[in-house]
């Protein structure tokens, strides 16, 4: 895996890429999403096996993310033409069908390299997922090996948790979901949470 420039707590590396959006080609810049959260996920290749399950799941939940002020962007090293061909392939035949999220082309592999997910020996991306906040700061990174897909529900939960901490200044314990108790991040006040949950 390549070492990249993406670091937690730092500005996410900006980029410009050609994407397929609603069946058409469009130039997308990360900086265009300033003011919104972004879930940026990398996947290995078009016309494969685990990848469509992830992309379709993110697409099917795009509105759930948008309700949180968050956009989802998918990226692979394939061209925009390959993305479009895959989108135009019916789901029953291993295709994607119409999508509610953009798919970005990274044919130069610069995005994958910059975000540290490039599998150099194969020239494809690992399954990297990055949560970028409304200020453009990278808040979360996970990278899966190729054979295991990611959880859209967990990505949604993480966005909700980061947004909660941004707004309220409290911290979210393991498995936190909206409406659950949080912790006041100081020695004395945190005891309220621990006495209730232990």
From Swiss-Prot:
Its EC number is 1.11.1.24. SUPFAM superfamilies: Thioredoxin-like (SSF52833). This is Peroxiredoxin-2. GO terms for cellular component: cytosol; mitochondrion; myelin sheath. The active site is a conserved redox-active cysteine residue, the peroxidatic cysteine (C(P)), which makes the nucleophilic attack on the peroxide substrate. The peroxide oxidizes the C(P)-SH to cysteine sulfenic acid (C(P)-SOH), which then reacts with another cysteine residue, the resolving cysteine (C(R)), to form a disulfide bridge. The disulfide is subsequently reduced by an appropriate electron donor to complete the catalytic cycle. In this typical 2-Cys peroxiredoxin, C(R) is provided by the other dimeric subunit to form an intersubunit disulfide. The modification Phosphothreonine is found at residue 182. GO terms for biological process: defense response to tumor cell; extrinsic apoptotic signaling pathway; hydrogen peroxide catabolic process; hydrogen peroxide metabolic process; negative regulation of extrinsic apoptotic signaling pathway; negative regulation of extrinsic apoptotic signaling pathway in absence of ligand; negative regulation of lipopolysaccharide-mediated signaling pathway; negative regulation of T cell differentiation. The active site is at 51 (cysteine sulfenic acid (-soh) intermediate). Residues 6-164 form the Thioredoxin domain. It is found in: Cytoplasm. The modification N6-acetyllysine is found at residue 196. Homodimer; disulfide-linked, upon oxidation. 5 homodimers assemble to form a ring-like decamer. Interacts with TIPIN. The keyword Phosphoprotein applies. One of its GO terms (molecular function) is selenium binding. The modification N-acetylalanine is found at residue 2. Widely expressed with highest levels in bone marrow. High levels also found in heart, brain, kidney and skeletal muscle. Lower levels in liver, lung and thymus. It catalyses: a hydroperoxide + [thioredoxin]-dithiol = an alcohol + [thioredoxin]-disulfide + H2O. Pfam families: 1-cysPrx_C, AhpC-TSA. Its main location: cytoplasm. PROSITE patterns: THIOREDOXIN_2. Belongs to the peroxiredoxin family. AhpC/Prx1 subfamily.
């Amino acid at each position: 895996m390549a070492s990249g420039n993406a670091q937690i707590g730092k500005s996410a590396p900006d980029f410009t890429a050609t994407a397929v959006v609603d069946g058409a080609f469009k130039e997308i810049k990360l900086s265009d999403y300033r003011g919104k959260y972004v879930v940026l996920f990398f996947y290995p290749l078009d016309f494969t096996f685990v990848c469509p399950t992830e992309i379709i799941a993110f697409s099917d939940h795009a509105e759930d993310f948008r309700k949180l002020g968050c956009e989802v962007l998918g990226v692979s090293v394939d061209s925009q033409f390959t993305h479009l061909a895959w989108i135009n392939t019916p789901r029953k035949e291993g295709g994607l069908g119409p999508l509610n999220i953009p798919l970005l082309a990274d044919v130069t592999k610069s995005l994958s390299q910059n975000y540290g997910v490039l599998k150099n020996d194969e020239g494809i991306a690992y399954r990297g997922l990055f949560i970028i906040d409304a200020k453009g700061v990278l808040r979360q990174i996970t990278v899966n090996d190729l054979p295991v897909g990611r959880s859209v529900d967990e990505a949604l939960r993480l966005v909700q948790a980061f947004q909660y901490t941004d707004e309220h200044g409290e911290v979210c314990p393991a498995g936190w979901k909206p409406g659950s108790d949080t912790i006041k991040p100081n020695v004395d006040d945190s005891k309220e949470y621990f006495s209730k949950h232990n």
